[in-house]
Amino acid sequence: MNLNRQYVNRFIDDAIQYGDYEREDNYYLQNLILEITKAESIDETKNNNGLVNPTSNEIAQFWIQQMLNNGLLEDVVYQKEIVETKLLDLITPKPSTINREFWKRYESHPEKATGYFYQICKRNHYVKEDAIAKNIHYYTETEYGDLEITINLSKPEKDAKEIAKAREAKQSSYPANALCMENEGFVGSVTQAARRNHRIVRLNLNHQPWGFQFSPYAYFPEHSIVLSEAHEPMKIEKQTFSNLLQFVQKFPHYFAGSNADLPIVGGSILSHNHYQTGRHTFPMDHAPEMKQFKMEQFPDVQAAILKWPMSVIRLKGEDLDEMTEAADHIFETWKSYTDEKLDIRAYSQDGTRHHTVTPIARFNQTTSEYELDLVLRDNQTSTQYPDGIFHPHNDVHHIKKENIGLIEVMGTAILPGRLKKELLEVERYVLGDINAEPGSHKKWADKMKEKYNFNNENAKNIIHQEVGRIFKRVLEDSGVFKQSTEGQKGFEKFIQTL
């Protein structure tokens, strides 16, 4: 296999412009490219193979396809990603260079620093904009405001061959998980993602070392992760509230939140302490305050219950220390709070703790105040609700049965990719196609048929909006104090204990 001279030159130019190389590194880079692609030499002919003014990523994808065509690479996701990240690492500065440049730009303005880093991560295809663009995205109007609905199609699914290889592969404990620092520059394997082009910015939160990185398959603009350098499990504590507030003080254009630290109500990774951040206005940000209240011991902190399907207390203030203390007071009170009448129990008889919070911090540019939202969570199960009392109930599992994590708590649904095909079947079914197979959605589809007069013009939109209403139900199921009179009285009773 020979590589096209124009593409090699273009790639080398990008490595010199964007990476850590100079013009004298020309032949060195050329030989690295030949080694990574397993090519024998370079074709000096002028044929550009149809790519006009290609990006480095487009050239990398072209070479990967060439390798597949020549039997030099197996057509499985992890092997293609290893080659891709090795190539695109060449156009990426070293971690030390990025860290130096990031903090130099930060002195001028925090947005310049994150903007610089984000451009690098998009250019080297660590942030996969092309994949993210495949996601289905729309809004549904509800009594709580517009909920944001996404069907996640960006992450490539492993095929049977790759799953079998992963099962047979020797399990490695390095890197320990997908969120530890050791992933920076890691070559990848059948069981662990290729991260050769991955970079992490180092930062301190409360004098402890943390890392800041962007998320490859983002759920919203500049979706990023702040991860502890220490290998420690997810933990909600006083330090968490302080860290989140300190992060938004450093980066006021980003929000910062943490998943809860208990199963069922937590995120998918509980083994490594991390927060999620980014530049996005979530539906919950607009939630109106239903009832304001004061806690005497924290005179400078305003508090309010939000009109939201989940049970949220919003704290507002300018003194970060006092806000941290107020948040910790609410958290500690909630951890031991029980209301049998509402099925709310802090501990099982065997001493298992059930209560925690999902905290979200932001700096409100309009009021120049810090805000800290505490979403009350309870992870009990029961005979009636074996998956969780305050978790999506069985009748909505056909749309969503996974944990309700931080992003969804804020009103942005991350629905499974399977729904794209399944909803097309539902659409065919409601339009009267006798060969349609609505599967687990049949009961729901029949209800919609009774409610609406479907035609080719309105079917897709009606189905999408009904999915949005099911997501509203999912959030209501997950709320501990329900929107009923009894539920809201229960919420006020809890507030009085503060």
Swiss-Prot record:
Its EC number is 2.7.7.12. It comes from the Bacteria. NCBIfam families: galT_2 (TIGR01239), PRK05270.1-2 (NF003629), PRK05270.2-2 (NF003633). The gene is galT. Pfam families: GalP_UDP_tr_C (PF02744), GalP_UDP_transf (PF01087). GO terms for cellular component: cytoplasm. Pathway: Carbohydrate metabolism; galactose metabolism. It is found in: Cytoplasm. It catalyses: alpha-D-galactose 1-phosphate + UDP-alpha-D-glucose = alpha-D-glucose 1-phosphate + UDP-alpha-D-galactose. This is Galactose-1-phosphate uridylyltransferase. Its main location: cytoplasm. Keywords: Carbohydrate metabolism, Cytoplasm, Galactose metabolism, Nucleotidyltransferase, Transferase.
